[in-house]
């Protein structure tokens, strides 16, 4: 799905292998707060290796004696990885369950503490990643590329995981827009997200291709750093350009839905022109009831550090909720993901 999308720093020359072992992909979830210690929900921090999120949630539900829909999470995590993530168990008026029964060689309970709010999808600050890429080849320019990514970022593309194996989530969305009824709400949401993500990626790729990844267009919608507050100005000013250069504001692209575009003027015309070939997709998202939203055009990994040792690169960084680690890797090198006989279910994204 991402093969035709533009690269911010040009097509990478380096090659490597991602996830040769589960320990090569470590994700630690950061809620951004600590559970308060009281309330009818129990937040459970779990370390799991080679297990998917839904399976572990089912084990926790059985241990707590509750229905499986009483167990929630902030974001799906890759199966072939070592991940630390939080689960929420709704236990109103019930005593603390013995969750140790779910522990095994691949599952450890790290913490359990009550909280007064439900753990919902996206209810987190972000994720800390430590990746180990092996079998490096043609890596002479890798150090310079790492420096460029650290200072300029990468395209904030939705990763392959959003679209399903072979793009089957998009095929399902297309069928749904053509009139096929999807009764399962979760599947329907998945297909709508895939369609919306495809359109977003198309806008981002077009801006990069036109040399507009770091350049303001009249009417561009920008987002304040560290918040989801957005605004647009039809008349470009030196002050706004300076704020963009300093990182105080970020360029954004449309997440398509009902209502007026938040961008104006030339920026709105650009987005509409890019999406003109996707009119049926846009119409389908609007009829499904999704509203216009925005997402940053670029993604700048935080706390980024790395160690190059022969044919092995160890890379660490923090990404905000909703961002994809594989989008960082894609810009860095042509990484082949080791085949472990199952599809990775997600990429530590928070379910934008």
From Swiss-Prot:
GO biological process, one term: tRNA pseudouridine synthesis
Active-site residues (renumbered): 78 (nucleophile)
Keywords: Isomerase, tRNA processing
MF terms in GO: RNA binding; tRNA pseudouridine(13) synthase activity
Domain of life: Bacteria
Residue ranges of domain TRUD in the record: 153-299
Matches recorded under SUPFAM superfamilies: Pseudouridine synthase
EC number(s) stated in the UniProt entry for this protein: 5.4.99.27
Swiss-Prot/TrEMBL catalytic activity: uridine(13) in tRNA = pseudouridine(13) in tRNA
One Pfam family, short name: TruD
One Gene Ontology cellular component: cytosol
UniProt xrefs under InterPro entries: PsdUridine_synth_cat_dom_sf, PsdUridine_synth_TruD, PsdUridine_synth_TruD_CS, PsdUridine_synth_TruD_insert, TruD_catalytic, TruD_insert_sf, TruD_pseudoU_synthase
Family of the protein in this entry: Belongs to the pseudouridine synthase TruD family.
Role according to the record: Responsible for synthesis of pseudouridine from uracil-13 in transfer RNAs.
Annotated protein name in UniProt: tRNA pseudouridine synthase D
Species, as recorded: Aeromonas salmonicida (strain A449)
Lineage: Bacteria, Pseudomonadati, Pseudomonadota, Gammaproteobacteria, Aeromonadales
Gene: truD
